[in-house]
Amino acid sequence: MKNLLTISLLLLSASLSVSAQLRPDALQSEYRPLFRPDTLSICFIGDVMLHQAQIDRARLSEGNWDFSPWFEYLEDRLRAADVAIANMEFTLPGAPYSGYPCFGAPDQYAQWVADCGVDIFLAANNHIFDKGTAGAMRTLEKYREMEAARGIRFTGLSGDGNEYSRTNPLIFTVNGFRIALVNFTYGTNASLKKEWPKVNRMSDKDEIRAAVERAERLGADLIIALPHWGEEFKLKHSKDQEKMADFLVGAGVDAIIGTHPHVVQDTTSISRSILHRGRVPRAPVVYSLGNSVSNMSAPNTQLELLVNLRIARDYGGFIKILPVELVWLWCSRPGGFRDNYTVIPVKDFIGKSKLWSGKFDYDNMVDTFKRVSGAQSGEK
């Protein structure tokens, strides 16, 4: 009997010990889901330009520049994204530097853009050959140096066949997502006879289709087209842009973010046919982001967009694009918000006219925003 009592007490003690180890709060603290959804945010800004007035404003002394105030209110948004992408509408040819019509910026300008949080440079635009073959090649050299030293990637321009294959499409992996970028331009202001350096061109649909197919073979989760296209200063996209967008979605592109018109154009989404390749049922299209920073003052050219493309993978492993976030920006010139170039989020500053040095710029921002943002979306 004593032995049975002893055994019973031992069993009870062991049971209490196990119960203590497996109490509900302990189980909760150790819980880990078998799968979790992944998310990725990619933000895009428009034309980063450098007119002569900007060069003069930023120059501190010979070889010394200060661009830092220009993105003071923007850089936190760039850094908050998992990946930030900008259209670099200038060359890095070395001194002397110049603005429109042949853009040649100091090397520090590209470094500053990267300092603000931009991770990928888009080089396919109409100004990339403004300084000829030598200017384009030196731009490539500087971008390669930044890639080696800082991990900054680039696409749209290549110096040889190997670089073309590596950057068209440009593929990167972040947060478990494999993303492919296909960047191309409608043309260039200068025509070159040499094969290299080569800019990706919109007219060569076979090469664009081949780039999309390479991206698919390489396992891209999402393919984004970044065309430099459209008519300058037009708020509505053209028929040619619409036809090209249809071609891109039919070829397998999942999202389209455009530049070049220097103004914000309408946004839409295109339904994908079941006969089309692709990973999402509807492809968002932003026809033009507008400028990012420039000295332009023509109607609508100071209003611009930052687009935040948010991508998610659900518990089943399926990719989806969340509603596109549009952040309206205003590029204030010297004498406006303050005595320098400043890119500001419009909604953060509406109702704060007392912060402005020049009231005309504030009124222009509010009027332009209300007029342009009113009817900028649609679906097909």
Give, region by region, the residue ranges found by the protein language model.
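Bacterial Sec-dependent N-terminal signal peptides
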Residues: 1-22
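Acidic, metal/ion-coordinating pockets
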Residues: 21-380
